[in-house]
Every structure is written in C-alpha cells, then in structure tokens.
C-alpha cells in the first residue's frame, strides 16, 4: 500500500555515516546517493559486491567489477562532526529561523 506522504530520512547525500550492523559493522564512509522510496543508500566503500559483466559493444572484454550496493538506512548512523562517533540527530531552528540538523551527543550542527 503506497503512501503519498514524503518520508523524512536522517541520512542525506554527502553525510559521513557509520554502519551499525551487518558485515561492514563499524566501517564509515560518505553517502553517495539516497533512494527515499526504498529507504536505501549507497555509501562509499561499504557493501561492496562483485558484478560479472558480459562482453558488449561498450565493454568488449566484459569482466569482473567491484562496486557499492545499496544498504538500508536503518543500518546507518550519522558520524558526529566533533567526535567522529555514531550519533542520533535532531532538528532545530538556527538564528535565522532555518531548520538545521544537529548531533544529539555534542550539539554540533551537521553540515
């Protein structure tokens, strides 16, 4: 049952994140892209899979390529800009009345 309501995610493109569960636990990386519909993100250097490509006109020899696969955002936490540890985030208004994200542990504004 699809909903028209837009989902609010704690992860955005360009964020530094830490993996909290799975094979890549405790590894960190930068978010390359986010799929809001499926709640997945592609993180640099995380969840590497091996793809076997058939020879085509563009790639005459084919070959084996390692690339990042999407990972569910529930397995990711934002890295605190101050300490580098995993932290939850909150939202608050800054001096100009604009909503900003901040790290709950240190109070540091994210991005």
Curated annotation (Swiss-Prot):
Write one Pfam family the protein is assigned to. ribosomal_L24
What does the UniProt keyword field contain?
A: Ribonucleoprotein, Ribosomal protein, RNA-binding, rRNA-binding
Q: Does the keyword Iron apply?
A: no
Provide the GO biological process annotations.
Answer: translation
Gene Ontology cellular component annotations, sorted alphabetically: ribonucleoprotein complex; ribosome
Q: Which Gene3D superfamilies would you find in this protein's record?
A: 2.30.30.30
- SUPFAM superfamilies the UniProt entry points to: Translation proteins SH3-like domain (SSF50104)
Q: Which NCBIfam families match?
A: rplX_bact (TIGR01079)
Q: What does this protein do?
A: One of two assembly initiator proteins, it binds directly to the 5'-end of the 23S rRNA, where it nucleates assembly of the 50S subunit. One of the proteins that surrounds the polypeptide exit tunnel on the outside of the subunit.
Q: Tell me, how does this one assemble?
A: Part of the 50S ribosomal subunit.
Per the similarity annotation, which family is this? Belongs to the universal ribosomal protein uL24 family.
Q: What is this protein called?
A: Large ribosomal subunit protein uL24
Organism (species)? Cytophaga hutchinsonii (strain ATCC 33406 / DSM 1761 / CIP 103989 / NBRC 15051 / NCIMB 9469 / D465)
What gene does the UniProt entry assign to this protein?
A: rplX
